[in-house]
């Protein structure tokens, strides 16, 4: 993540939060395409990983724009969209902060 600390917890062990920069998020959606050599389950898992990775990268990019070096309290939402449920949408969000070594 290019030096960005990311965590689902509201704090980071050994770090002191010196500034809260606010809410950041990343959203991504990917169509599920089943390749002739894979089964449907594998296709959905691949699409989910792709959309999670993209959403996380977008969230980190948004935090960097604010001057953050960490994101705390990360959470995510998932949805199947499209007429046939053939698209996975992922939203990842958290709080951008600036941290320094505690002590």
Curated annotation (Swiss-Prot):
Coiled coil: none annotated. It comes from the Archaea. SUPFAM superfamilies: YbjQ-like. This is UPF0145 protein MJ1413. Gene3D superfamilies: Hypothetical protein apc22750. Chain B (3.30.110.70). Belongs to the UPF0145 family. It holds the Pfam family YbjQ_1.
């Amino acid at each position: 993540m290019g030096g960005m600390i990311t965590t689902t917890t509201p704090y980071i062990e050994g770090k002191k939060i010196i500034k809260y920069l606010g809410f950041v998020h990343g959203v991504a959606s990917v169509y599920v395409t089943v390749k002739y050599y894979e089964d449907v389950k594998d296709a959905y898992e691949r699409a989910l990983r792709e959309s999670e990775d993209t959403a996380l990268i977008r969230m980190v990019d948004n935090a960097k724009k604010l001057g953050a070096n960490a994101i705390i309290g990360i959470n995510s939402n998932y949805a199947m969209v499209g007429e046939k449920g053939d698209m996975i949408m992922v939203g990842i969000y958290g709080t951008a902060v600036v941290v320094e070594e505690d002590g």
